[in-house]
């Protein structure tokens, strides 16, 4: 296995909670599948594959792609205006009246955080220059820049886990449950190691019933299936 701790920065990001529509609630941290999608897009930019094949290759390559809670973050709503029918009809509205009728709005939550850190575990080594091409974590406004990639062998440590884990793995701790898409796009119940206090999400922790490993600031369970 190959282990990476990725640090990304962004003005804001939004990964929509599954099963919501008009008010698009956002996860406080990116989902595993969003990270896999970002890696697949990076592989395409690097010329390693093309189109949907990149997503399939990324899904087969990644063992775990889990966000790590390392600091405070805040969510806030924003109103997004969209022009409907442009892609479907392959044309712009003919006039002002048509344009007004084609406009629609929705409320979407966004997240502000100083940095986003992600633990990535892969079956084969991924060149760091490919990881640094990861450019989006979420919707079309969720652009990020990868500023650091720590590659190394994790060491045995202890304490509470600070990455998202499957809820069945959690014994106790301070965390929030979310149903989200895992690395293969399947719906799973995850324990996110964050808790909301006064409108701000703060770092929590999850106690698991196995040995714990550390890579940089990421603390995660040993083995797989978590």
Swiss-Prot record:
GO biological process per UniProt: defense response to virus; maintenance of CRISPR repeat elements
Keyword line: Antiviral defense
InterPro entries in the record: CRISPR-assoc_prot_Cas5, CRISPR-assoc_prot_Cas5_N, CRISPR-assoc_prot_Cas5a-typ, CRISPR_Cas5_sf
Superkingdom of origin organism: Archaea
Induction statement: Repressed by 5 J/m2 ultraviolet light and 50 mM NaCl, slightly induced by 20 J/m2 ultraviolet light, 100 and 150 mM Nacl. Member of the csa5-cas7-cas5a-cas3-cas3'-cas8a2 operon.
Keyword Ribosomal protein on entry: no
Family that this chain belongs to: Belongs to the CRISPR-associated protein Cas5 family. Subtype I-A/Apern subfamily.
Assembly and interaction partners: Can form a Cascade complex with Csa5, Cas7, Cas3, Cas3' and Cas8a2.
Role summary: CRISPR (clustered regularly interspaced short palindromic repeat) is an adaptive immune system that provides protection against mobile genetic elements (viruses, transposable elements and conjugative plasmids). CRISPR clusters contain spacers, sequences complementary to antecedent mobile elements, and target invading nucleic acids. CRISPR clusters are transcribed and processed into CRISPR RNA (crRNA).
Protein name per Swiss-Prot or TrEMBL: CRISPR-associated protein Cas5
Organism: Thermoproteus tenax (strain ATCC 35583 / DSM 2078 / JCM 9277 / NBRC 100435 / Kra 1)
Gene: cas5a
């Amino acid at each position: 296995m190959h282990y990476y701790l990725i640090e990304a920065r962004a003005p804001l990001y939004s990964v929509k909670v599954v099963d919501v529509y008009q008010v698009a609630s956002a996860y406080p941290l990116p989902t595993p599948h969003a990270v896999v999608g970002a890696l697949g897009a990076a592989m395409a930019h690097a010329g390693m594959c093309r189109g949907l094949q990149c997503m399939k290759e990324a899904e087969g390559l990644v063992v775990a792609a889990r966000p790590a809670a390392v600091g405070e973050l805040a969510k806030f709503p924003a109103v997004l205006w969209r022009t409907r029918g442009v892609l479907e009809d392959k044309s712009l509205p003919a006039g002002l009246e048509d344009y007004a009728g084609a406009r629609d709005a929705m409320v979407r939550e966004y997240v502000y955080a100083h940095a986003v850190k992600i633990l990535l575990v892969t079956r084969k080594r991924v060149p760091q220059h490919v990881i640094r091409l990861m450019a989006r974590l979420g919707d079309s406004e969720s652009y990020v820049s990868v500023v650091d990639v720590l590659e190394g062998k994790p060491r045995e440590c202890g304490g509470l886990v600070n990455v998202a884990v499957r809820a069945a793995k959690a014994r106790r701790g301070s965390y929030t449950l979310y149903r989200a898409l895992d690395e293969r796009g399947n719906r799973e119940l995850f324990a996110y190691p964050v808790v909301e206090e006064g409108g701000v999400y703060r770092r929590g922790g999850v106690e698991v019933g196995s040995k714990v490993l550390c890579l940089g600031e990421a603390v995660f369970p040993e083995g797989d299936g978590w």
